[in-house]
């Protein structure tokens, strides 16, 4: 479970992150990263904030929940790699349904590396 200080808590935070942030995709996930979350009172103290989007295209409810749990553990383990004021949305793609936790971790890390090169 993500601690509340590391969760995106409302639709405005998701919307701003997806629309204003940078994006990097891999085969199983798309990472939306918004480093300037301090604009418009979006950021609060406590470190980076994460949100997950796992749509019905990924699979049935059991599959979506499993993918969500895997991604939650991946982002919490990587939280120190993100600036404290950043917002991150991880969107799962249909291939995430059959990916292992290690594959998801590798794809999130590769997307983060790509975003770091863009900055």
UniProtKB/Swiss-Prot annotation:
GO terms for molecular function: 3'-tRNA processing endoribonuclease activity; ribonuclease P activity; tRNA binding. Gene3D superfamilies: 3.30.230.10. Its EC number is 3.1.26.5. Keywords: Endonuclease, Hydrolase, Nuclease, RNA-binding, tRNA processing. One of its GO terms (biological process) is tRNA 5'-leader removal. It holds the Pfam family Ribonuclease_P. It catalyses: Endonucleolytic cleavage of RNA, removing 5'-extranucleotides from tRNA precursor. The keyword Hydrolase applies. SUPFAM superfamilies: Ribosomal protein S5 domain 2-like. One of its GO terms (cellular component) is ribonuclease P complex. RNaseP catalyzes the removal of the 5'-leader sequence from pre-tRNA to produce the mature 5'-terminus. It can also cleave other RNA substrates such as 4.5S RNA. The protein component plays an auxiliary but essential role in vivo by binding to the 5'-leader sequence and broadening the substrate specificity of the ribozyme. Belongs to the RnpA family. Consists of a catalytic RNA component (M1 or rnpB) and a protein subunit. This is Ribonuclease P protein component. It comes from Corynebacterium diphtheriae (strain ATCC 700971 / NCTC 13129 / Biotype gravis).
């Amino acid at each position: 479970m993500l601690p509340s200080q590391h969760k995106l808590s409302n639709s405005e935070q998701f919307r701003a992150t997806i629309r204003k942030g940078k994006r990097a995709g891999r085969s199983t996930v798309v990472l939306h990263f918004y480093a300037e979350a301090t604009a418009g009172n979006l950021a609060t103290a406590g470190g980076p904030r994460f949100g997950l989007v796992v749509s019905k295209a990924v699979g049935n409810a059991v599959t979506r929940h499993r993918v969500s749990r895997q991604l939650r553990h991946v982002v919490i383990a990587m939280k120190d790699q993100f600036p404290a004021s950043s917002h991150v949305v991880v969107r799962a793609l249909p291939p995430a349904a059959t990916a292992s936790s290690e594959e998801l971790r590798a794809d999130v890390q590769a997307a983060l590396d790509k975003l770091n090169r863009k900055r």
